[in-house]
């Protein structure tokens, strides 16, 4: 039997992991500059957490979750299909509001959804995102949006459009739902099967349809902005003012909705034409009622966003943004010419590594010529060729592989030079 990766999953190989590290480190750095701390939650949760948190009528809960029962007596568990509900669960369980009135956390996590695999969309994939819990102020919305766009700018992606909308409060959404159903009823026979299913359960999601045959119908539908309460209007206007003052361009799109039921008021999405049909880079919004939906006595205002790493990597590859991102290379490669030299090299490599220096040596017993090829393949900066003569004299030739410049050093000098160069690289 030939074992392979499961459909919708992907190995991240050593030849590409440096790109992932670059993205993750950049993302983590921006989050930390904005005052966010990392959170990690279990990969599976109670199924009820997502049913209540995301909403029974959503596509995710309806058909995309990987759920299982460890045994007939136990409750159903689910591999997390998103991170907001688990983060809110952790916030409530550990009383994080007592630590800080505004809890700001970020995550870089694996997500699981039963979706049709395609470019940038897997069944097991990675997301990064953040949640600001405890503030109902519009500046929290604006900060999260600015944080999201700053991540993409730091990664070199500047060709994007920010779409904004407000979904209002519960009363606004109920009034809009009724008006939307009234509008869509005469067009019901023209709807596709997915939209017909959504008509009763969640008609707002019909506005999110990517079916071009429905574009004209959707264009004429009543907008939720027509039903906003005064407080939501003022909140949304203030968010826009903060973004304008920050110099961030955006488009107010009254057709923008989010695929999860917990969203209220501000909703946003970052899109790029460089991704083709699947143009969304990231998205998020405010979800002030999620805490009470999950059983909390008091509401906890919150806003956040999430973004897929695989899709980000696709666009970065397309824009050639990894050209200067190289795998970590050894500072020094020690090549040996005799058994005695091997023994010395092994001890020296170990000493250098304990000093925090990236150094490599041959583990295959290859010839000197093959070792030199390996040094070049790994892009080592220096190579040190060690034979019995070098060991007897205590003098070693250190060669710079790019310039071919050579210097003669003692063993102590080698350590000093490697330590100095490592310190400079870190600085």
Curated annotation (Swiss-Prot):
It catalyses: tRNA(His) + L-histidine + ATP = L-histidyl-tRNA(His) + AMP + diphosphate + H(+). PROSITE patterns: AA_TRNA_LIGASE_II (PS50862). It holds the Pfam family HGTP_anticodon. It is found in: Cytoplasm. It comes from the Bacteria. One of its GO terms (cellular component) is cytoplasm. GO terms for molecular function: ATP binding; histidine-tRNA ligase activity. HAMAP family: His_tRNA_synth. Homodimer. NCBIfam families: hisS (TIGR00442). This is Histidine--tRNA ligase. It comes from Chloroherpeton thalassium (strain ATCC 35110 / GB-78).
């Amino acid at each position: 039997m030939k074992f392979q990766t499961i459909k919708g999953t992907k190995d991240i190989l050593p030849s590409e992991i440096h790109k992932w590290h670059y993205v993750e480190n950049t993302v983590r750095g921006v989050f930390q500059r904005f005052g966010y701390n990392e959170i990690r939650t279990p990969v599976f949760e109670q199924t009820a957490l997502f049913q209540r948190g995301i909403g029974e009528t959503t596509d995710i809960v309806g058909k995309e979750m990987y759920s299982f029962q460890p045994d007939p007596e136990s409750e159903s568990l689910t591999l997390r299909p998103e991170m907001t509900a688990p983060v809110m669960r952790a916030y409530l369980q550990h009383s994080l509001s007592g630590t800080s009135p505004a809890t700001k956390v970020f995550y870089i996590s694996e997500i699981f959804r039963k979706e049709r695999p395609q470019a940038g969309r897997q069944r097991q994939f990675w997301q990064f995102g953040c949640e600001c819990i405890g503030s109902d102020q519009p500046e929290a919305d604006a900060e999260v949006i600015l944080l999201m766009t700053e991540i993409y700018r730091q990664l070199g992606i500047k060709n994007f459009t920010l779409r904004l909308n407000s979904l209002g409060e519960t009363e606004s959404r109920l009034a809009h739902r009724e008006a939307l159903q009234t509008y869509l009823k005469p067009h019901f026979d023209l709807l596709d099967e997915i939209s017909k299913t959504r008509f009763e359960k969640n008609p707002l999601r019909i506005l999110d349809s990517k079916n071009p045959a429905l574009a004209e119908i959707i264009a004429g539908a009543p907008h939720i902005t027509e039903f906003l309460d005064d407080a939501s209007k003022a909140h949304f206007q203030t968010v826009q003012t903060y973004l304008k003052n920050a110099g961030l361009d955006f488009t107010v799109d009254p057709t923008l909705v989010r695929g999860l039921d917990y969203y209220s008021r501000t909703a946003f999405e970052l899109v790029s034409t460089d991704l083709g049909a699947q143009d969304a880079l990231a998205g998020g919004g405010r979800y002030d009622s999620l805490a009470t939906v999950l059983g909390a006595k008091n509401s906890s205002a919150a806003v956040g966003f999430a973004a897929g790493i695989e899709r980000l990597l696709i666009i970065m590859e397309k824009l050639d943004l990894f050209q200067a991102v190289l795998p970590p290379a050894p500072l020094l490669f020690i090549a040996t010419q005799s058994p005695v030299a091997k023994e010395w090299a092994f001890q020296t490599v170990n000493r250098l590594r304990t000093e925090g220096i990236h150094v490599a040596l041959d583990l295959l017993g290859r010839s000197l010529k093959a070792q030199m090829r390996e040094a070049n393949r790994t892009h080592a900066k220096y190579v040190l060729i060690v034979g019995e003569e070098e060991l007897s004299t205590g003098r070693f030739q250190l060669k710079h592989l790019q310039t071919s410049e050579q210097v003669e050093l003692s063993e102590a000098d080698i350590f000093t030079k490697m330590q100095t160069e490592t310190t400079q690289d870190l600085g």
